[in-house]
Every structure is written in structure tokens, then in C-alpha cells.
Amino acid sequence: MSAELIAVYKDEQIIDLESAKVLGLSDGIKALNGTEPIYFDDSPLALEVIRHSCAHLLAQSLKALYPDAKFFVGPVVEEGFYYDFKTASKISEEDLPKIEAKMKEFAKSKLAITKETLTREQALERFKGDELKHAVMSKISGDIFGVYKQGEFEDLCKGPHLPNTRFLNHFKLTKLAGAYLGGDENNEMLIRIYGIAFATKEGLKDYLFQIEEAKKRDHRKLGVELGLFSFDDEIGAGLPLWLPKGARLRKRIEDLLSQALLLRGYEPVKGPEILKSDVWKISGHYDNYKENMYFTTIDEQEYGIKPMNCVGHIKVYQSALHSYRDLPLRFYEYGVVHRHEKSGVLHGLLRVREFTQDDAHIFCSFEQIQSEVSAILDFTHKIMQAFDFSYEMELSTRPAKSIGDDEVWEKATNALKEALKEHRIDYKIDEGGGAFYGPKIDIKITDALRRKWQCGTIQVDMNLPERFKLAFTNERNHAEQPVMIHRAILGSFERFIAILSEHFGGNFPFFVAPTQIALIPINEEHHVFALKLKEELKKRDIFVEVLDKNDSLNKKVRLAEKQKIPMILVLGNEEVETEILSIRDREKQAQYKMPLKEFLNMVESKMQEVSF
């Protein structure tokens, strides 16, 4: 079965077997020229077809179990597929096995999946009395609609789909949630069931293993267990509280970045948290980003709480006159920003309403774009290497709606391409995916569970310098407009630390661990030595804790291990008298002894091992 053709890929579109017939091709899909065949396997294109059909299998099963069920949409998403629906019956996660069993029953029935096309009028009549399907049709332009049918079940859909339910053998329903109709909080709440599907048993098994690992590594769970951060309903959703250990971890990353930024010629700056709405109108945020912003009024003047740091940095640039000799100017700020996110999308530290960006803006001449971007790529590589992340780049080019002339866009895009080539970085191209004001490079990192995360970005901006009338004096003593490069490598500290926590499963490397060394005195008489050693380690900028509660030695060691502390030192008579320390080293997965002075030198050198 693995070699069976299920669809083809042509002109960036998947065409299934049924669609080929509807197109009037006498030999079906084989008559299509210039196509890429899609076979039944675990390749990305095949999985899109498989998961879409599995969403319909889910809907068919729900209809059989709950005859009053009505369906909205059931798309393929990054984590599999889902279907939004409503029913008068109460459904919980306990019902998922029953629904899954019904899906398997229909799959074994080997139902042919067929397609027909209807006019809008016919489709409205076919789904008469189904307000959810009418809502779907109201959002679709055009007068032709596809309807796919399997057994007694049919659904409005453009495809693509498998030719038969017999292909669907390896799937799993993963969770149940609520979802507002069309994502609008003002609409009714629907039920959403998520699922996953693969062509092979191995694909499903590997995925389910990853899901279990992800649950163990969930940064929200680790945040509580390790005392890193918390949320408080009295404060508000999406507003994290950094606890001492989490703040230590974050500070270490901030300090390492600051050292590197200063060495790379960046200047620290700081803008206000709130700015008059007048500047947000100049920047375009007021017209294009207002729904994501918070506002307040002071002395009858409207202010916007900043969702981005760029305007503040522009004002820093405008605080003095500049010549070509000053450029490039590199400003950085750990800028706190606020963005209005709907409550349904908030997710631990990954999606919050207040966060801090490792933000920088570079003001340079057009000719300096390539060298500046090249330096950022070098910086990015060192950071990702330090945290053991693999990563990929995506270059986004000019969209249909944009400002500036073709020549400027082409030069800016080529400068980014040349910088990527200079560093021998393979990259994908997202045609038309750039911002309206310039091309960009997105940095996507891959964690230990092979999940990809969008973090940093490098954006060339030719819009804001024009809006704010920025200028520098060039070599000919004429005013020239600088280019502005927006640059964030981590993205935000909140998001990066969430990803970092899950990547390492809380076992942070020594150089950023919130507690690097645990000292465990066996008895009260060893406590003085532990405190002296603690002071020596603190002088070397080591985060150290003395576990001196009145517990058994084994319990204290287990506590330190549970807290995922990289080094544990047990201090007894022998250690105090000889100053030869007993060390449990998580990284080396070993226990060994070392003289005190040698140990202090070792941890000092470990702190110097990592730099960006």
C-alpha cells in the first residue's frame, strides 16, 4: 500500500484523484503533466491528504454517534487536524476512545471517498438548515463548491482527500477543547477535537512517544517544579511572575548577551513604556496594529503602551544629527512590550501579553546592509551553538502590497541572499512573505524533540525611516535616508526560556542553570564549612544553595536531583578536614573527588567556556 498514488502536487497545489476526475481528465490523475506524484507514506504532502481525510472520518463518526451534530471546519494544522462542531450532547475527553472506535469501524468498511461540485445555490440548498455550513460558505468567494462523500456522510470541502477510508489505519484523537465560532469571542463556543494520523504504524508510534516526552518537558510543568515562574489570576492572564530561580536564569542569559553586544559595537538605549498616540500614527501602528495595543489617557492626551521598541529607537536616532561616519549605529534594548492577545491563545511563556524582547535596531546606509546582516548571522550561529540548537533560515520576499520601487527591493533582497550565502546557510524562500516595508529573514530553531519554533527575525525596513524623515549626511554632504534593520535573535526572553526549558527538559547547562551547585552538609558541624564555600563560589558568580534543612542525607540529595542542579557536593568530616570535595556531576554522569582549590578553578573556567 505504501507505493499507492493518492494525489499529485502541481502549481503549489495538491490535486487528489477525485479532483482529477471532476476536472474532466479521461485518464484521471495520470493525465496531468508536470506534476510531482504523492504516494501513501509519511511525507509532508501525503500527511496533509491523510490528515484531512481523517478529519472527515472524525466528523462522520461524530454524526453517527451524535445525530444532531453540526460541523464548522476541519482543517489540517501543524499538530495534526481538528474539527469544530456543536451538539446538544455533553462530550468530554472520556468520550474520545468511543469516537475513535467508531472511526476505526468506518475505516474498516473501506468506504469510497467521492467528490461532486455544486453551485452556491445548490450548496445552500443541500445544507439547508445547517447554519454552520452557511457560515462557512459566507466566507468563501466564488460560486463553485466541492462536496466530498463517504458512505452516508458528506461535507462541504475543497479537499484534498484519499480515495478510500481503507487507508486510515494509524490515527489517534489527542485532545478536546473549546473554540469560538470563527475565532471570534463574540460568537458561540463550539467543541474542537484534535487528532493525528500517519500512513505507518511507526510514524504514529514515534509521534505518540514525542507527545509523552513533550508532556514531561512542558515548560509550564517545569516552571512550577523548578520554581522558575508563575501566573496569578489576581494579576491577570498572560502576565508572568518571574520567581528568584527563573529570574537568575534569565539574568544570566541577559548578561551573556549584553557582554557580546557591547563587544560587537552595540550601544544600550532605553525608551519609555508609553508614547503619545501621535507617534503611533506616524509609524502606522495606530492604523494597522491598534487592535493589538493597549491605550491610556493622561491629561486628556491619548498614549499607547508600546507593542514594539522601534519607535523609541527612532527617537534616540533623532536626538542628534548624524553623518555617514557615524554609521552603522547599533542600538539595543531589553524592551518590555505589551500586546493584546486573546485569552484562548495564551500559553504559558510561549504566548503572553507582556514580554521582553532582545531587541536591536541598526541604522545604516544601503551599502552596509549585507555586512550588518552577515554580522547578525554570525552572532546567531554562536548563540544557537551555545544552547545546542540546530536552526534554519527562511527568506521572505516582496509581497503584493508593499512600498518602495522594484530596484530597491531587489537590492535589499539580494543583500540578504548574499549574507546567507557568505555563511553557507541553506535557506528556504517564502515568496511574497515579506513585510510591506522590506524583506526579512526568519530564524527557526529545532529542539530536542525535533519541533520547530519561530524565534528571531532580521527585517530590512525602508518604511519607518521615510515616515519619520530620518536622515544622515553622506559623503557628498547631501541628506540621505538610512535603512533601518530590526533584529531580535531570541525573539523574547519569555518565549526563548520556555523553548529552552523544554529543549533540555529542565536540565539546563551549567552556565545558565538557575542553581548551579548544591552544597549538602551532613550534620550541623559541617554547616560553617558549607557557608564559607558558598561565599567563595558566589565571588565567582556561581548560583549556589546550601540545603541545610533537618532532613536525611538521601532526602536532601534526592531534592537536589529533582531540582536538576548540575553539581551536588556532600560535605562531611572528610571533606571539612582534607578540603577534598565529593562531587556528583550530572553532566559527566559521574561522582569524583577534587581538591577545593582545583574545584574552584574548574567552576571558574566552566563559566568562561561559553560566550557569544
UniProtKB/Swiss-Prot annotation:
Its EC number is 6.1.1.3. It comes from the Bacteria. Its main location: cytoplasm. One of its GO terms (cellular component) is cytosol. Residues 218-509 are annotated as: Catalytic. Its cofactor is Zn(2+). The keyword Transferase does not apply. Zn(2+) binds at C310, H361, H486. It is found in: Cytoplasm. GO terms for molecular function: ATP binding; metal ion binding; threonine-tRNA ligase activity; tRNA binding. InterPro entries: aa-tRNA-synt_IIb, aa-tRNA-synth_II, aa-tRNA-synth_II/BPL/LPL, Anticodon-bd, Anticodon-bd_dom_sf, Thr-tRNA-ligase_IIa, Thr/Ala-tRNA-synth_IIc_edit, ThrRS_anticodon. Catalyzes the attachment of threonine to tRNA(Thr) in a two-step reaction: L-threonine is first activated by ATP to form Thr-AMP and then transferred to the acceptor end of tRNA(Thr). Also edits incorrectly charged L-seryl-tRNA(Thr). Homodimer. This is Threonine--tRNA ligase. It comes from Helicobacter pylori (strain HPAG1).
